[in-house]
UniProtKB/Swiss-Prot annotation:
Organism: Escherichia coli O6:K15:H31 (strain 536 / UPEC)
S-S bridge residues: C44-C265, C187-C235, C216-C223
Keywords on record: Disulfide bond, Hydrolase, Metal-binding, Metalloprotease, Periplasm, Protease, Signal, Zinc
Protein name: Penicillin-insensitive murein endopeptidase
Keyword Glycoprotein set for record: no
Compartment(s): Periplasm
Gene: mepA
Function per UniProt: Murein endopeptidase that cleaves the D-alanyl-meso-2,6-diamino-pimelyl amide bond that connects peptidoglycan strands. Likely plays a role in the removal of murein from the sacculus.
Cofactor needs: Zn(2+)
Amino acid sequence: MNKTAIALLALLASSASLAATPWQKITQPVPGSAQSIGSFSNGCIVGADTLPIQSEHYQVMRTDQRRYFGHPDLVMFIQRLSRQVSNLGMGTVLIGDMGMPAGGRFNGGHASHQTGLDVDIFLQLPKTRWTSAQLLRPQALDLVSRDGKHVVPTLWKPEIFSLIKLAAQDKDVTRIFVNPAIKQQLCLDAGTDRDWLRKVRPWFQHRAHMHVRLRCPADSLECEDQPLPPPGDGCGAELQSWFEPPKPGTTKPEKKTPPPLPPSCQALLDEHVI
């Protein structure tokens, strides 16, 4: 499937979810031992943790949306990464969407983030902490040129390279999605230490943030992991293909109905949503 078709599918998946979903009616984590269930784009979570809003190392954006829930592994990853960044004097980590209290489908903006193992992190590290007003209405910093072929040199900073590299080197991280132009710049800057680049995957948009995804926890037996990224640093022909014009004759895919929920997620909805 070519990249244009993939983009249209992603857009349709997002558009199909614009109507309110029953998952929004669950306002607190479902009690129980932490279990990520299903796939990243069709799943849920039992026993989610709440990311503490107050921290000296990070700040949480758009708290009014209440998307700061996730598997304990995700909460620990955020705390671990932000401590590393702080200890290196790089700035404050800005945390975007994680998941809803029980995971599940959003009413827009995300096709994934459903199992408590995904988090969006802004690609800027302010030295001065943001105000409450800034956090509620954050201003994204678009790092990619208008033509989409490279990063904006005046905006690309060594600490952003280091932030992505630190995240990719974390033992629990399986993928990081960034714009192809950002991946390209990482490839140029990486030098000889390149193993971590395998986890950094080019994807549509993601011009101002990275989307970090963790592996399925070993004790989440109903969690469905993605296949590992292809071997290598991903800096060759695969990356360059993202900068090629779409092939002629690309047709808009048919609108698809979301797949059935995993049985455990459907049972969770049946029990907790009237």
